[in-house]
Amino acid sequence: MSLQAPKGTKDLLPTESYKWQYLENKFRNIAADFGCREIRTPVFEYTELFQRGVGETTDVVQKEMYTFEDKAGRSITLKPEGTSPAVRAFVEGRLFNETQPTKMYYFTPVMRYENVQKGRLRQHHQFGIEIFGAKDASVDAEVISIPVGIYKELGVEGVELNINSIGCPKCRKTYNEALKKYLSKNYDKLCSTCKTRFDKNPLRILDCKVDTCKEIVKDAPIILDYICDECKDHFESLKSYLDVLDIKYKVDPFIVRGLDYYSKTVFEFIIDDITICAGGRYDYLIEEIGGPSMPAVGFGMGIERLLLTLQEKAIEIPEEAYVDLYLGNMGDKAKLEVLKLAKELRDRHIKCEIDHMGKSVKAQMKYANRIGAKYSMVLGEEELNTGKVSLKRMEDGKQIEVDIKEIDTLIKVFK
């Protein structure tokens, strides 16, 4: 029996990788426009990082993490999200001693044991941005504007931005009391997980995916009615900044996000009732992980989910030709010359492909056409004797005669 990729994973084949490269290049350029620099963190971390950062009572920690003991008996977890590792690296690298804010972006695989379905894999990839050291709501608005710009540049329409504030630990305590009072009336109907959350972290019940719990929380108290004046001012400022940036939004008081580290601002980008990007502020996570008290805000965007959206919206990603020139040959002597010419061109960053299979000239030209080469030429005995060769533009068949030895002249055709 042939081996297959594990359930919930997907190979990225060369026929699809150009789409990822296109998006990654676009994301890098946009991140650079905002002054962000790249960070790369390990694919696995100590489990405690996610227990402390993401939260013991979250679905991610309780149900979805890939956790194991290494040979030394240490508990290790494959990265289920990108923010906690970025914060850990920020603290461990003592970047808090540098001039703030610190702006980072990353591409990372994340692993969660979830039910596999359309657009949801057990290993998927995220593009994320994290900004440390700035507490003003203008930073929240700036972070939110990045996905807005991405969707606009890609031509994705129909994306809705939902925002909320879940307050700070001080005002959340008051809200939790009101929420527990409301939930106590239907305590017996809560799922077993939410019964555990009732005392430990009732806010998590608002994020439960079980139908009975979703029905119960429909009429729950709204957290915006309980946030303190400071959090209220921050949220009002955020809305003002979004208005100035002409970013349309809707306030959804039931967004809480599935991770415990969030405070104040939380947001989601929705299309066709599916979340395609989400984030928020996490002003207490850096201190929780061992750093100083320092504000932070960021987001994560699933790349597979974005690609699926582009496909559903019939938005095509342009495929660049990966071969500039196909160099055909007839005979061993010509093959030697082709090898030498290909090396000279590759040294000048011209993408070349040559025949290694001993194909006929007709088969070589078919291959050149199939791989999408921009140009082709064939060297044989006559071309070697005259030093001249016909360079064919594959798009329309137009040919020009070039001198084999005039590399600079040949280069100009491709530049």
Curated annotation (Swiss-Prot):
Keywords: Aminoacyl-tRNA synthetase, ATP-binding, Cytoplasm, Ligase, Nucleotide-binding, Protein biosynthesis. One of its GO terms (biological process) is histidyl-tRNA aminoacylation. The keyword Iron does not apply. Its EC number is 6.1.1.21. It is found in: Cytoplasm. InterPro entries: aa-tRNA-synth_II, aa-tRNA-synth_II/BPL/LPL, Anticodon-bd, Anticodon-bd_dom_sf, His-tRNA-ligase, HisRS-like_core, HisRS/HisZ, HisRS_anticodon. GO terms for cellular component: cytoplasm. Pfam families: HGTP_anticodon (PF03129), tRNA-synt_His (PF13393). SUPFAM superfamilies: Class II aaRS ABD-related (SSF52954), Class II aaRS and biotin synthetases (SSF55681). It is an enzyme of class 6 (ligase). It catalyses: tRNA(His) + L-histidine + ATP = L-histidyl-tRNA(His) + AMP + diphosphate + H(+). Its main location: cytoplasm. GO terms for molecular function: ATP binding; catalytic activity, acting on a protein; histidine-tRNA ligase activity; transferase activity. Belongs to the class-II aminoacyl-tRNA synthetase family. NCBIfam families: hisS (TIGR00442). HAMAP family: His_tRNA_synth. Homodimer. This is Histidine--tRNA ligase. It comes from Clostridium botulinum (strain Okra / Type B1). The gene is hisS.
